[in-house]
């Protein structure tokens, strides 16, 4: 297994709180993005102080209460499974904040981090405020939930999005990249993918590769895996009979998502 595919490594932090993923602890080759996934039982409490990072808490499933000492967001979360395909609630917290997350049911939260040196207001990102977008055509269709797009000034660095891809389709396709700080043509953004698959015994394929091929890994990605994209193209293919969900976290020196398609495959857009 290459260094870009991360399997769940569960660690019980306290009673009722289990750390499932932690890219920083696994020494992922990233400078701007960090990602954790935490399972929380009902009435259990996860707590953290952010330091020099901002954080977006995404309620992947279940319900929780989030507080930062000034704000209390009670019983947030909208779904028992991501494959209900409806937006969820999230909370943005700026650097220097301390927060707690209390399970009001059995829940799973994603903690999406990026460096930040400017404090911004804590904000509840309601499911009803999440932009919904259908992208692509033919076998390149996907449903997108824009939690923190670059048009939303809630965050300093973070970009957060959920993508649903149905059976037999591709996403992040044609292959695109955002690994050069060359605005207005392309921005440099690192990225993580947290994957879920329905039904859960399935898998998807993801290839991460640069133009020089100094990075070139093709992975069979299973339910609950994380894929690291430090640079390069990163398409995802979904086999027949299965559906794909992934949560993307992106960040870089400038908070703009400007990508460039691989020229060899850009022709598919003109069909």
From Swiss-Prot:
SUPFAM superfamilies: RmlC-like cupins. Its EC number is 5.3.1.30. Pfam families: KduI. It catalyses: 5-deoxy-D-glucuronate = 5-dehydro-2-deoxy-D-gluconate. Keywords: Isomerase. The keyword Isomerase applies. GO terms for biological process: inositol catabolic process. One of its GO terms (molecular function) is 5-deoxy-D-glucuronate isomerase activity. The keyword Coiled coil does not apply. Pathway: Polyol metabolism; myo-inositol degradation into acetyl-CoA; acetyl-CoA from myo-inositol: step 4/7. Belongs to the isomerase IolB family. Involved in the isomerization of 5-deoxy-glucuronate (5DG) to 5-dehydro-2-deoxy-D-gluconate (DKG or 2-deoxy-5-keto-D-gluconate). This is 5-deoxy-glucuronate isomerase. It comes from Shouchella clausii (strain KSM-K16). The gene is iolB.
């Amino acid at each position: 297994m290459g260094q870009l595919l991360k399997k769940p490594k569960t660690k019980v932090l306290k009673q009722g709180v289990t750390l499932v993923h932690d890219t920083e602890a696994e020494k992922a080759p990233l400078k701007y993005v960090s990602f954790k996934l935490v399972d929380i039982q009902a009435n259990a409490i996860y707590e953290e102080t952010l330091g020099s990072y901002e954080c977006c808490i995404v309620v992947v499933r279940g319900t929780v209460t989030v507080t930062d000492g000034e704000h209390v967001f009670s019983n947030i979360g909208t779904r028992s499974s991501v494959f209900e395909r409806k937006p969820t609630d999230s909370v943005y917290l700026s650097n220097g904040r301390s927060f707690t997350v209390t399970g009001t049911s059995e829940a799973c939260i994603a903690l999406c981090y990026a460096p930040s040196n400017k404090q911004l207001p804590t904000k509840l990102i309601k499911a009803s405020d999440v932009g919904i977008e259908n992208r692509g055509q033919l076998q390149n269709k996907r449903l997108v939930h824009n939690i923190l797009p670059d048009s939303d000034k809630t965050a300093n660095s973070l970009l957060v999005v959920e993508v649903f891809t149905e059976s037999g389709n591709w996403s992040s396709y044609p292959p695109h990249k955002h690994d050069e700080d060359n605005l207005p043509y392309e921005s440099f953004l690192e990225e993580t993918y947290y994957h879920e698959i329905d039904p859960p015994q399935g898998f998807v394929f993801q290839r991460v590769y640069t133009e020089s091929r100094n990075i070139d890994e093709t992975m069979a990605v299973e339910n609950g895996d994380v894929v690291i994209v430090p640079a390069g193209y990163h398409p995802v293919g979904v086999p027949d009979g299965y559906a794909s969900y992934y949560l993307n976290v992106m960040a870089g020196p400038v908070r703009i998502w400007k990508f460039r398609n691989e020229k060899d495959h850009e022709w598919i857009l003109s069909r």
